[in-house]
Structure formats: structure tokens, C-alpha cells
A protein has these predicted regions:
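Hydrophobic/basic alpha-helical segments
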Residues: 1-145
Length: 145
């Protein structure tokens, strides 16, 4: 992950775009000899994994950066399905059960918030149980004395 001194993600998105372009290249060569199911496995292995890594942090980047990633993801989906370069990808995403870049970012951010709240809840329970245990210990000591 790359972030500059101005706290922008341009360098990271540029690097990520290169990785995603390479993944598109692999899929474009693979699609002629592999099934769609296999191409989807490769998509998850080399495209999706790069796309979603750290998106909780860089997901708040500029609209321009998100658009770059959307273009690459749309190209990837068209490659896998042999769709024309100018065709709409909305139906393809639905048909394949894939999430779009913006949806993946939102989903991962929501998961992080949920995990954080669950951890806070567990921490609260742990503190409460310690407090109860300490109160019981004090009561036992008071009764014994």
C-alpha cells in the first residue's frame, strides 16, 4: 500500500491499476482455453484479491481513482465473457454474481464497522465480567472479615 505525505492514494491506485491490468492480460490469454468457471476462479485469485486488499483505507479516494478501477473491472468482466468492448456490464455482473468496485468497497467498510462493534461488545462484556468478579471477591473478603 502506498500513501504520500499529502494523504492521497494516487500512487497506490496507479500501482493497483498496473496489477489489475496484468490480471486482465492473463485472463485475455486464458479465456480461449478455459471455461468461464475457471476464469472466475482466476478472477478471484488475481484480480479480486488485489482489488479488495486494503480497500477499507483507500476506498475513500477520489472519484477519478475509483473510476479508473471501475474501467479495469468492467474490462475484466468483458474479457471473461467475450462481451464487446462497448457493451454494458450491468447484466454481466448480475449474471456472474460479482460485485462492482463501489459495492465491494462499501461492503468491506461495513464489515469492518461490524467487526469493530462486535469487538467493542465483547470488550464490554469482558470488562463487566471482571467488574462482577472483583465485586464478588470484595464481598467474600468482607463477609470473611
Amino acid at each position: 500500500m502506498f500513501i504520500d505525505k499529502n494523504l492521497n492514494w494516487n500512487h497506490h491506485i496507479t500501482n493497483l491499476s498496473k496489477q489489475l491490468s496484468r490480471a486482465n492480460g492473463v485472463l485475455s490469454k486464458l479465456r480461449y482455453n478455459a471455461s468461464l468457471e475457471f476464469c472466475l476462479q482466476v478472477y478471484y485469485a488475481i484480480f479480486y484479491s488485489h482489488l479488495t486488499y486494503g480497500c477499507n483505507l483507500w476506498g475513500f479516494t477520489s472519484e477519478e481513482n475509483i473510476s479508473k478501477l471501475e474501467v479495469l473491472q468492467n474490462k475484466c468482466v468483458r474479457i471473461m465473457t467475450f462481451a464487446p468492448f462497448n457493451s454494458s456490464t450491468n447484466e454481466i455482473f448480475i449474471e456472474l454474481g460479482l460485485g462492482k468496485v463501489r459495492d465491494l468497497i462499501s461492503l468491506n467498510q461495513l464489515k469492518s464497522v461490524y467487526d469493530f462493534t462486535q469487538n467493542c461488545y465483547l470488550l464490554t462484556l469482558w470488562i463487566f465480567s471482571l467488574t462482577v468478579a472483583m465485586l464478588i471477591q470484595h464481598l467474600v473478603n468482607w463477609i470473611v472479615l
